[in-house]
Amino acid sequence: MSKKRRLFTSESVTEGHPDKICDQISDAILDAILEKDPNARVACETSVTTGLVLVSGEITTSTYVDIPKIVRDTVREIGYTRAKYGFDADTCAVLTSIDEQSPDIAMGVDKALEAREGQMTDEEIEAIGAGDQGLMFGFACNETKELMPLPISLAHRLARRLSEVRKEAILPYLRPDGKTQVTVEYDENGKPVRIDTIVVSAQHHPEITQEQIERDIKEHVIKPIVPAELIDENTKYFINPTGRFVIGGPQGDAGLTGRKIIVDTYGGYARHGGGAFSGKDPTKVDRSAAYAARYVAKNIVASGLADKCEVQLAYAIGVARPVSISIDTFGTGKVSEDILIEVVRNNFDLRPAGIIKMLDLRRPIYKQTAAYGHFGRTDIDLPWERTDKAETLKEQALALAKQ
């Protein structure tokens, strides 16, 4: 291998992974509340272990939802329906500990600092300050049609396929827990040229042989997903490399909401501000601003203004306007990054209320994002994945570049 060639690896997990169970429960509760009370404040955390689900957090709402029922329905849908799996939707204990949102935080969110200072009218913005300080990143690149890095794109598709072959009884001996990992080789120009390594770990019935699992995973999971032209005789496969994966899910490992933030985003290919998504209503900029940053980055790449783009947004609690906007095109930009920032400011309202309005976020759309990634999804329609501003950005940026 040439010195200039490099390898990059990303991983994904199935919906039955303990941390992902928690993300899905937290977002199922969020969706159920938003369906009845779109203005609710929700920060819902879930923990799972053998036979137990604990739901805690801060929720301020005018509605009632049956949290234990939502938990059991979600666990059942994932596929934990038998005690011998070590976790059963009908028999697991469900504990809840829910408080209201701190009034100190609510005060800052309810009426943004600028509005309190008289710099803005309530008509200009619904006066929502950021629910916390923090920094968020969005990223896009032209490695795939959905403008995502190839390693995480393939890892997600393999993980989703693992669940499909289980639920459709193509491989009925599989159980819900599983992980995937893909290593891509990039050439001297940074273009993906081949798959170096594929790792798949799939929980299974104890009677199935390792040989059958290897054969079936290659045939029914990897082959339909990974493009044949990226595979060669040197591609390495590690399928259940320990030789046995019977004990899994919450019986094998405890799980927590928000512990798969790299899986949820770009697989480590781009930077991450540290904030998790699931269980948070859209006034939490950890979630809404990360979605907005992806929306911005994707439209910049879709416009042809850059091959690769990373957007950073940062906020102060109670303050609506971002304290900073930063754009990095890694030397691939067709115009300067200053011009890109200017056209972004002109075309995207990146105040929390502006983001909520722009992306129509006060809706029950979140549970579907809680497994297999929040970005680059082609199986569901997500507003931050649209490229409706690409042409406008291109026209304005090129006009500014000529001045």
Curated annotation (Swiss-Prot):
The enzyme class is: transferase
Residues at which K(+) binds: 45
Q: What is its main location?
A: cytoplasm
Molecular function GO terms recorded: ATP binding; magnesium ion binding; methionine adenosyltransferase activity
Q: A GO biological process this protein is involved in?
A: S-adenosylmethionine biosynthetic process
Where does the chain bind L-methionine? Answer: 58, 101, 253, 284
Instruction: List residues binding Mg(2+).
Output: 19
Needs which cofactor?
Answer: Mg(2+); K(+)
* Keywords, ordered alphabetically: ATP-binding, Cytoplasm, Magnesium, Metal-binding, Nucleotide-binding, One-carbon metabolism, Potassium, Transferase
Keyword Transferase recorded: yes
Q: What is its EC number?
A: 2.5.1.6
User: Where does the protein end up?
Assistant: Cytoplasm
Q: Which reaction does it catalyse?
A: L-methionine + ATP + H2O = S-adenosyl-L-methionine + phosphate + diphosphate
**List of residues binding ATP:** 17, 177-179, 244-245, 253, 259-260, 276, 280
Q: Where is this region: Flexible loop?
A: 101-111
The record's annotation in SUPFAM superfamilies points to: S-adenosylmethionine synthetase (SSF55973)
Annotated Gene Ontology cellular components are:
cytoplasm
Q: Which domain of life is it from?
A: Bacteria
Family the entry assigns: Belongs to the AdoMet synthase family.
* Subunit details: Homotetramer; dimer of dimers.
What is this protein identified as?
Answer: S-adenosylmethionine synthase
Q: What is the scientific name of the source organism?
A: Geobacillus sp. (strain WCH70)
